[in-house]
């Protein structure tokens, strides 16, 4: 496995870098409050700029507005965006996970209606899978969709739903047949988040934000054209989302957007910490872990690039990335102290939010 860019990849990296150099002055801050409407609007506008600059939907087929490139180009773009200290796309869930599901399983009408607005940030999407009694055991979902005339009536609850508070649509897994084995009685639906009967309640985190939500459905009416992948085929459709979810979480972050030299600089700024043997050991462990994550991610990318199905390393990427994030946050908090959680600190997001990704995408 060659870890260097090919000439074509090096050219693509330079193209991305030039675009970012020319546009990053218009970028909003890399992080902000999820309940700040002005910030979310700025992120939508930035995603539109990224799409216009061919930096959104990089792996989507060209016929749906994407670039038709491979996962390696996606990682190159992620790396350059992180190095430029600008935010990436706002709707990672939509473009990284739900859009590919619609491309694979959606009707022509669904693709035409939703993929363009999703790509340009006009429609943000959320994933309506987890329930209070159905997390990693996803097939145990109890949210019910029953036939009601020529449509469906949806009743139930979802939890830990990221971005539901400003999403236009959600992709929801519901039980449509309780008389068959649990994996067979499921159907996937598109749900307008402003539909009558939908209630969204934020879940406050240690960071003070409420990026996760509970979502309640009380006799929500859905038309038959909101079914994705066919009635009773929800489990297979959900597996497509889950595959892209693990890849998005594990590979899309490219080391959480942090490189070991940034942690070394933070430690080096404190003379006492930089001489502390335990701090130096922890920094060395973290640098090794980040390098291992990157190399393991490259193994997955190489398999995908060669048309192969990645092995367990694809799922492990998510787990190891989050574990490294927790270790990194603890190291920075110990070295910098309370100032690391200040509102304008570049480390606040790492320390207070990323540990929550332990639950994201299943455990």
Name every feature range the model reports, one short phrase each.
Residues 1-90, 113-120, 249-250, 265, ...:
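Amphipathic, small/basic residue-rich leader segments at the start of a protein or domain
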Residues 7, 198-294, 357:
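Glycine-rich beta->alpha junctions and the first turn(s) of the following alpha-helix
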Residues 47, 51-122, 162-169, 290, ...:
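Internal helix-loop-helix
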Residues 121-129, 173:
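A short, Trp-centered hydrophobic/proline-enriched beta-strand micro-motif
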Residues 143-146:
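A structural signal for short hydrophobic beta-strand segments in well-ordered beta-sheet cores
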Residues 155-201:
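A short core secondary-structure module
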Residues 281-306, 322-323, 327-334:
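Loop-to-helix element that buttresses phosphate recognition and phosphoryl-transfer chemistry
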């Amino acid at each position: 496995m060659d870890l260097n860019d090919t000439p074509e990849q090096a050219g693509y990296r330079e193209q991305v870098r030039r675009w970012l150099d020319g546009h990053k002055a218009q970028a909003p801050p890399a992080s902000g409050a999820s309940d700040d409407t002005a910030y979310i609007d700025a992120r939508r506008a930035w995603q539109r700029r990224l799409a216009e600059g061919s930096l959104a939907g990089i792996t989507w087929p060209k016929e749906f507005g994407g670039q038709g490139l491979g996962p390696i180009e996606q990682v190159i773009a992620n790396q350059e965006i992180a190095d430029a200290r600008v935010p990436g796309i706002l709707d990672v869930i939509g473009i990284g996970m739900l859009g590919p599901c619609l491309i694979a399983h959606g009707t022509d009408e669904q693709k035409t209606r939703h993929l363009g607005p999703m790509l340009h940030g006009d429609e943000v999407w959320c994933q309506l899978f987890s329930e209070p009694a159905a997390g990693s055991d996803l097939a145990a979902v109890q949210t019910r969709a029953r036939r009601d005339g020529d449509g469906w009536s949806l009743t139930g609850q979802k939890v830990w739903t990221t971005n539901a508070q400003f999403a236009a649509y959600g992709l929801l897994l519901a039980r449509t047949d309780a008389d068959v084995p649990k994996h067979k009685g499921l159907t996937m639906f598109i749900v307008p988040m402003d539909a009558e009967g939908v209630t969204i309640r934020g879940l406050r985190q240690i960071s003070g934000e409420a990026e996760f939500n509970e979502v309640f459905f009380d006799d929500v009416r859905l038309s038959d054209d909101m079914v994705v992948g066919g009635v009773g085929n929800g489990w297979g459709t959900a597996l497509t989302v889950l595959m892209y979810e693990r890849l998005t979480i594990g590979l899309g972050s490219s080391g959480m957007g942090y490189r070991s030299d940034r942690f070394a600089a933070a430690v080096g700024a404190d003379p006492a910490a930089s001489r502390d043997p335990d701090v130096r050991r922890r920094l060395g462990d973290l640098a090794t872990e980040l390098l291992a994550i990157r190399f393991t991610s490259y193994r997955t990318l190489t398999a995908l690039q060669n048309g192969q199905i990645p092995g367990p390393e694809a799922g492990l990427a998510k787990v190891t990335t989050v574990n490294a994030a927790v270790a990194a946050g603890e190291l920075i908090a110990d070295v910098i102290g309370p100032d690391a959680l200040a509102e304008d600190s570049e480390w606040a997001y790492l320390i207070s939010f990323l540990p929550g990704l332990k639950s994201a995408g299943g455990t």
